[in-house]
Structure formats: structure tokens, C-alpha cells
Amino acid sequence: MSENKQLMKNGMWSNNPALVQLLGLCPLLAVSSTITNALGLGIATLLVLVGSNVTVSLIRNYVPKEIRIPVFVMIIASLVTCVQLLMNAYAYGLYLSLGIFIPLIVTNCIIIGRAEAYASKNDVLPAALDGLWMGLGMTSVLVVLGSMRELIGNGTLFDGADLLLGDWAAALRIQVFQFDSSFLLALLPPGAFIGVGLLIALKNVIDSSIQARQPKEEKPAIERARVTNA
């Protein structure tokens, strides 16, 4: 398996930051009440992940090991500030909706974890691909969880898409069910916990099913050496 395919498999499935590593749960649970919010935070996290991995990989040979963590945090904070300013300028409604969770990307364990575990030990291209696939893995879980919660809670999909994509995206809103009142359990953090648990359980079931279909490798017989005389 090529390195890119292995990185893709790890980021999207085998070592998914949300479903396997269980990192970044605070924004995952708090922001994913709609697809729009989930996608907005996912894109922001993806941009910071790729940017931080590339930057850390470029300077990895010039930063003393004793101060590498503070340097990584400063790099991540600078990139988050850039993303925050861009979102404030071009997606102000989404910026207000996400609120404090945009600057909190600085403390996201996914980003500092990939910078320390992978980017600081590899060249630029593999580090960029690692950030890309880990970011896409996190974004995919955010979007799936956001769609589940929005659909069950409000009976809609892509509500508020205009906050992210512009006024034309208001036409993307789909009313799947008509509720007299919102189902608050799905929209509040307890519903997010339940949703994440269901997604983790589903992944484990799929992994077990795939594992069961794999041919079992026969263990070679172990020959014991005789230590006594005949």
C-alpha cells in the first residue's frame, strides 16, 4: 500500500481522530447541531491542520527539542488567527454562530498531536497529506453527526447554508420532516454524546465484520527442542 493510501486509510477510518483517537470532542459535541456549523468548523480545522503540519515540517530541523511544543503552539495560534479573520470577513454569520470555538482550535489536541507525532518527523509532502486526511476525517464525522442531529432535532438539512456559502445557498435548505417543536435532546450536548456513541459503535461493527471475513492465518507449529537424553 502506498504511503498516500495508508495516510488516507488512517485519517478517514483506521485512526480517525474523532472515532478512534477521541480527540477534539469539545467542538465536536458543541458545534455539530447543524450541517452548516459542522462543515464550517471542519473546514477551519482542516486548513489549520494542513498549514501547521507543513510549517512544522519545514522548520523541524531548526527548532530545539526543548522548546518545540511552545513553538508549535505559536504556529497553530497564528494560523487560527488567520482563519478567524478570514471567516470574520467572508462568513460573518457563521463566525458569530461558531463563536468561541474558532479560537479554541488552538487547543485542539488533534492539531498539536499531528504536529508532534508526524509532521516534526517527516518531510513536507507526507506531513501535508497527513494533515489533509486527518482534517477530512474529522470533517466527515462532524458533517455526519451534524446531519443526524439537525435531521432528528429540526427535521431539516442544510439549514443556514447561506451563512457559509452566501445568499444563493438558502435554496439548499431541505425540510424533510415537519415538527411542531424541535426535539431538543438531539440539538443539545447529550444528543451529541449519544450520536458519537452510535457512530463509534457502527464503526466497530463494520470493523468486526471486515475482520471476520478475512482469512485466518494459521500459526506455525512450534517445535520444542529436546533437553533430555534419549
Curated annotation (Swiss-Prot):
Broad class of the protein's primary localization: membrane
Subunit relationships: The complex is composed of six subunits: RnfA, RnfB, RnfC, RnfD, RnfE and RnfG.
Organism of origin: Vibrio parahaemolyticus serotype O3:K6 (strain RIMD 2210633)
GO cellular component: plasma membrane
Name of the molecule in the record: Ion-translocating oxidoreductase complex subunit E
Transmembrane portions of the chain: 18-38, 39-59, 69-89, 93-113, 124-144, 182-202
Cell location: Cell inner membrane
Lipid bilayer topology: Multi-pass membrane protein
Matching InterPro entries: NqrDE/RnfAE, RnfE
Family assignment from sequence similarity: Belongs to the NqrDE/RnfAE family.
UniProt xrefs under PANTHER family: ELECTRON TRANSPORT COMPLEX PROTEIN RNFE, ION-TRANSLOCATING OXIDOREDUCTASE COMPLEX SUBUNIT E
EC nos: 7.-.-.-
One annotated GO biological process: electron transport chain
Function per UniProt: Part of a membrane-bound complex that couples electron transfer with translocation of ions across the membrane.
Keywords: Cell inner membrane, Cell membrane, Electron transport, Membrane, Translocase, Transmembrane, Transmembrane helix, Transport
